[in-house]
Amino acid sequence: MNKREVMKVENLVRNYKMVYSNRQDEEEIKVLKGLDFTIEEQEFVGIMGKSGCGKTTLLKGLGLIDKPTSGKIFFTGKDASELWSDELADIRRREIGFVFQDFYLLNSLSVKENIMLPMVLDKAPVDKCYKNVEAYAENFGLSHLLEKQPYEVSGGEKQRVAICRALINNPDLILADVN
């Protein structure tokens, strides 16, 4: 049985230009060099490497946050380079779950509101939001923390909150940039 293709990468290249204040020239740093791969539904893929080797750059590309220098990224068959910025934002909000190294929890929101945020942005019914948050909080051992602010919980608890937030909309793809 063939599985559905979620992500396809063709000849992905990402370079950065480094401009130095004490020099007249600029240097091009080649981070990703011609990557090709496919990710199918229900497939787990791990990307490992030394610090600074391009793992986060790759995840930002796969998450449609950063555009490649060249090459193609297809998400569920759609060529990301042909999509408008609002279409990319919709895909990121509805179909891709992110867990970042720094979590990016909003301290002005409670743990519950942070988990619920993707559903609220997607204009999901309020009762569904609360039901889903409570279910995820229960599964991840966070129920007792729902009314707390992110700055009141431990690093491990923040990571679990970020994971719940990434899963809450049942995305097609989950990207986790963790140490």
Indicate residue ranges for each PLM-predicted region.
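Catalytic Walker B motif of ABC-type/P-loop ATPase nucleotide-binding domains
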Residues: I174-D177
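Conserved ABC ATPase signature
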Residues: Q149-V153, E157
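The feature captures the beta-strand-to-loop junction immediately N-terminal to the Walker
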Residues: M48-K50
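Helix-to-loop junction immediately C-terminal to a conserved catalytic motif
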Residues: G63
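Conserved catalytic motifs of ABC-family nucleotide-binding domains
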Residues: N170
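Conserved ABC transporter NBD signature motif
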Residues: G71-D79
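Short coil-to-helix segment of the ABC ATPase nucleotide-binding domain corresponding to the Q-loop/switch region
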Residues: L109-L117
